[in-house]
Amino acid sequence: METRAFWTTLLLVLVAGSSCKAQEFVGLSPSQCMVPANVRVDCGYPTVTSEQCNNRGCCFDSSIPNVPWCFKPLQETECTF
């Protein structure tokens, strides 16, 4: 019974995750792609898909019109002491 609950939960998570295609951050941390719309640096071209954008190492977010949807991520900084 526990196995069935596990697979049901996994299926729900996968379905919920795949239903939201506005933001894609494959291989990047979500914090790297939290770039304000007014400072996004274009990383694609007008008809770029989220997959093509991610293959370039860039973030994809089509939820805001009239700004680059494929844009360069923020650089993560390392703390040095």
From Swiss-Prot:
Superkingdom to which the source organism belongs: Eukaryota
Every P-type domain range: 31-74
Entry-linked PROSITE patterns: P_TREFOIL_1, P_TREFOIL_2
Tissue expression remark: Expressed in goblet cells of the intestines, and colon, in paraventricular hypothalamus and supraoptic nuclei. Weakly expressed in gastric epithelial cells (at protein level). Expressed by goblet cells of small and large intestinal epithelia, kidney and stomach. Expressed in the paraventricular hypothalamus, arcuate nucleus and amygdala of the brain. Weakly expressed in gastric epithelial cells.
Signal sequence bounds: 1-22
GO molecular function: identical protein binding
GO CC field: extracellular region; extracellular space; secretory granule
InterPro entries, A to Z: P_trefoil_chordata, P_trefoil_CS, P_trefoil_dom, P_trefoil_dom_sf
Triggers of expression: Up-regulated by hypoxia in gastric epithelial cells. Up-regulated by hypoxia-inducible factor 1 alpha (HIF1A).
Keyword field: Cytoplasm, Disulfide bond, Extracellular matrix, Secreted, Signal
A Pfam family reported for this protein in Swiss-Prot or TrEMBL: Trefoil
GO process terms (BP): maintenance of gastrointestinal epithelium; regulation of glucose metabolic process; response to peptide hormone
Location(s) in or outside the cell: Secreted, Extracellular space, Extracellular matrix; Cytoplasm
CDD domains linked to this entry: Trefoil
Keyword Repeat: no
Cysteine pairs bridged by disulfides in the record: 33-59, 43-58, 53-70
Quaternary assembly: Monomer. Homodimer; disulfide-linked.
Task of the protein: Involved in the maintenance and repair of the intestinal mucosa. Promotes the mobility of epithelial cells in healing processes (motogen).
Protein name stated in the entry: Trefoil factor 3
Gene designation: Tff3
